[in-house]
Amino acid sequence: MTRYEYLLSCLVLRLSEMNGVSVRIISKDMYLCRALSFSYTNIGKNAELLNHFAKIAKENELTIKTCFVGKSQRLANSDKEWYKKNELENEDFFPDMTIDIDKIKIPKEICEKP
């Protein structure tokens, strides 16, 4: 398993279940960057996955930058309730998360190609 395949399994597969945020994965490898970028909606149902990302980030001393981008007219009531519950401002904006996979620490044996 290569380093990127490991990242795919521990991060991107989680993203496939997550339909609440726009997630931008950045890397020096621009082809990889494009391949691993996903966008989602309906954040209200996915607080657990956001917490999971926070845990991965902390374990890897990685900063997940969260900002609000792009006004959306499609906010469902559940989304508004989630923002209210979590005391976030700008409920009309979806968050954007940026993950720099080049900064994630990967076990040496996983970095090596099979």
What would you call each of these model-derived segments?
Residues 18-114:
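C-terminal functional segments of enzyme domains
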Residues 1-27:
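Acidic helix/loop or adjacent segment enriched in Glu/Asp that either coordinates divalent metal
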